[in-house]
Amino acid sequence: EGSLYGSAPGGALGVASAETRYFRISGYGRINNYLAVLAAFSGVLTSVTEAEDRLLDDFSDLTAQSWLVGLGAKGIFLKKDGASLTVSQPLKVTDGSASLDVPHGLGADGRVLRYQERIGLAPSGSETSLELTYRIKWSKSLELGAYGAMRYEAGHNPQLGLRSELATVVRGTF
C-alpha cells in the first residue's frame, strides 16, 4: 500500500491505493547438454485508485514493461561451474501521466498558492543492460561467483550514459 512499482510508500509522491495487473511470458530451450537460451517479457498495467492530497494526483493508467534475452552455460571450465550472458531492459514505465501540484507563492492570508500541471511519467531514457555472471561450486559448502554489468542509461536516465559494475560473491552454508 502507498507505493508504485516498489517505490517508497507514503510521502508527497506516495499513493493511497493502486491496482496492478501483471503478466510474464518466458521461455527456456536447451541447445545442448551445456548451453541453453532464455527469454522473458513482462507487461504491467497499473490503475491508481486513490492519490488525493499528494504532490502527484489524477493519474492516468500506467503501463510498464521489461524484457530479457540470454544464454546460460554449465561445465565451462569445470564440471561444477556455470555462466550466463544476458541483455535486458529493467521495468520501465512506457505510458502514463499525472497532475503535478506546483506551489508558486503565498497569498495575503498565508495560504500556499498552487497550480496543476499535467506531466508524463515515462522516462526519456531506456536502460539496456549487458550482464555476465560466473559461478563455481568450490566445495559442498562454498560457492564463488563474479558478476559484471554494462548499463547504458542506468535507471532509464539518458544523462548517465554508460556505467559498469563488478561484484564478487562468496556464499557459504553451515
Residue ranges and their predicted role:
Residues 1-17, 22-28, 38-158:
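Outer membrane beta-barrel transmembrane domains
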Residues 82, 136, 161-174:
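Outer-membrane beta-barrel "beta-signal"
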